């Protein structure tokens, strides 16, 4: 069977995969869904220094620590930018990349490179409501049904602006 590493998007954590993981495991797959530094249950680590490279190293570190090879690396939303950085660093460990509702950057690109308008809006949000360095979550990101909507609202956390730059 396959080994999956599921990388969540901005404002989220490994919690967003909890309804998917049982299906993958029931099919006999090995599944890892780490929470990126400073987010969700790791929100106490949130700081202005956390950037995209921090999150790339979170995943590279997992692959090395667990000695994973032949990995199917899934990136949702912002996680797509993270997995692109991961495959740049350890391509020999990755079998497939799956971009799930995400941006698909070229090697070395960040969100600032892909969408200058979005990054400008995020900077404005950080200045207005996030002490100049963090972006607070907004809404439920398309989740409209209860109890999932309430679950998302309880679970999302602030995201460092530097992760998009």
Task: List the model feature ranges, each with a label.
Residues 30, 36-72, 88-89, 112-117:
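Active-site loop/oxyanion-hole signature of alpha/beta-hydrolase fold enzymes
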Residues 129-165:
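Conserved alpha/beta-hydrolase catalytic His-Asp/Glu region
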Residues 2-43, 64, 72:
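Conserved HGGG/HGGXW glycine-rich cap/lid loop of the alpha/beta-hydrolase fold
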Residues 74-75, 79, 83:
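Gly/Ala-rich beta-loop-alpha elbow adjacent to hydrolase catalytic centers
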Residues 19, 85-89:
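Active-site signature of alpha/beta-hydrolase-fold catalytic machinery across serine-
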Residues 1, 14, 23, 33-34, ...:
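Hydrophobic, aromatic-enriched alpha-helical segments typical of multi-pass transmembrane helices
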């Amino acid at each position: 069977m396959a080994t999956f590493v599921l990388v969540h998007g901005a404002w989220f954590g490994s919690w967003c995969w909890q309804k998917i993981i049982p299906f993958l495991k029931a099919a006999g797959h090995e599944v890892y869904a780490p929470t990126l530094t400073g987010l969700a249950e790791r929100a106490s680590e949130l700081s202005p220094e956390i950037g995209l490279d921090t999150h790339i190293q979170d995943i590279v570190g997992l692959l090395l620590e667990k000695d994973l090879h032949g990995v199917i690396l899934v990136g949702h939303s912002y996680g797509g930018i993270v997995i692109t950085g991961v495959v740049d660093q350890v391509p020999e460990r990755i079998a497939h990349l799956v971009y799930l509702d995400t941006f698909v950057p070229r090697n070395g690109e960040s969100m600032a490179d892909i969408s200058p308008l979005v990054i400008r809006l995020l900077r404005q949000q950080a200045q207005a409501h996030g002490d100049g360095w963090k972006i607070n979550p907004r809404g439920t990101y398309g989740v409209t049904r209860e109890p999932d909507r309430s679950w998302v609202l309880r679970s999302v956390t602030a995201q460092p602006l530097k992760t998009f730059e």
